Amino acid sequence: MIAIIDYKAGNLASVSNSMDRLMASYRITNRMSDLDEADGIIFPGVGHAVPAMRELKHDGLDTWMQSTRKPLLGICLGMQLLYESTTEGPTETLGILPGRLEKFDASQQKVPHMGWNTVEVQLGMETHPLLRNIPPGTHFYHVHSYFAPVTGHTVATATYSHPFCAIAARDNFMGVQFHPEKSGKAGEQLLRNFLDLVYGGMRTTTV
């Protein structure tokens, strides 16, 4: 079972619709017992980092996420909250990935960054499991005002005035800045890859 974390900041409907299309067993939840039972975690999100972190701390989800060894995929705000801090607020975030989120400069481009953008894989990251059957230079759908820095944990980048982290990974934690659930076949393939990673390619349903 995949647990989709509900912390009152998630794009839950579109993510759950994607899970339905992929015939995946899932549960939308903020209960520790469900997270403990889950095989993998999807951490979606849209909105503001400060109330999102407040909700995570209220439910004790922050400490659970920091210590879990289950495969976890953060989406959009969910990925951003995996970092150490953000200038949105500002506020400290989960500290799983190193780096601080910054806001795009509205004097250089429109903010938020909204629409389709090419994602370029970092050298040496071509075989990451999330990228299986996704060609180089694939476009994904973005909607965000803040961006993560390019670090040693960056799997792929996108560019909006300057490069930023589009896919990140560290141990069992993965994050995508874009919305795979709104990115057509390519996004569905990425979510399929996450499910295959969770279940070792041995899922009981076909897609």
Model-derived segments and their meaning:
Residues A38-D39, R69, P98, T138:
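Short, well-ordered alpha-helix to beta-strand connector turns
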Residues S67, L101-V207:
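Amide-donor transfer/coupling interface in amidating biosynthetic enzymes
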Residues I42-P44:
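Structural motif
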Residues M1, R27-E37:
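Short acidic low-complexity segments
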Residues I2-A24, P180-K182:
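N-terminal beta1-alpha1 ligand-phosphate binding loop
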Residues D34-L35, W64, I167:
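Structural alpha-helical scaffold elements that stabilize or flank donor/cofactor-binding regions
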Residues S18-S25, A49-R54, T118-E120:
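Short, flexible loop segments at the rims of nucleotide/cofactor-binding pockets, characterized by
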Residues G47-W116:
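Cysteine-nucleophile active-site neighborhood
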